């Protein structure tokens, strides 16, 4: 079992979420975090790691990175600035998705017939209540 030092992956980012795998059929599960990071101070999503910090790896990291990029571009409005990086942890391939603090807030998740914005508060992702 490979337990990771998260700070080695995300550097200066103080906010992050860990995902064991990319949820292709349920992109809202991780797109909420992308919206929340863009609407607040930015942050990182690490794919291929357990909640306890164990490096599990991804079977198709390159394909997953492409799907992440396409999903962000098709499901978030406006499209937030982000960066994808690969990280090899003792033979286990991980993806680190850095989402930068947005200038054009709010950043909405669009899918499942809804348009929702999220924010990050105390390590939790919350739906943002917007005034009309």
Q: What does each of the following model-derived ranges do?
A:
Residues 1-132:
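Conserved N-terminal catalytic/coupling substructures associated with nucleotide/phosphate chemistry
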């Amino acid at each position: 079992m490979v337990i990771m030092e998260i700070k080695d992956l995300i550097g200066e980012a103080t906010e992050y979420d860990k995902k064991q795998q990319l949820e292709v059929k349920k992109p809202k599960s991780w797109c909420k975090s992308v919206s929340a990071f863009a609407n607040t101070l930015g942050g990182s999503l690490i794919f291929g790691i357990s909640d306890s910090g164990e490096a599990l790896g991804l079977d198709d990291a390159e394909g997953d990175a492409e799907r992440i990029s396409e999903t962000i571009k098709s499901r978030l409005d406006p499209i937030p600035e982000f960066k994808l990086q690969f990280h090899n942890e003792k033979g286990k391939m991980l993806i680190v998705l850095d989402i930068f603090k947005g200038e054009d807030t709010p950043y909405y998740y669009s899918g499942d017939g809804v348009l929702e914005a999220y924010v990050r508060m105390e390590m939790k992702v919350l739906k943002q209540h917007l005034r009309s």
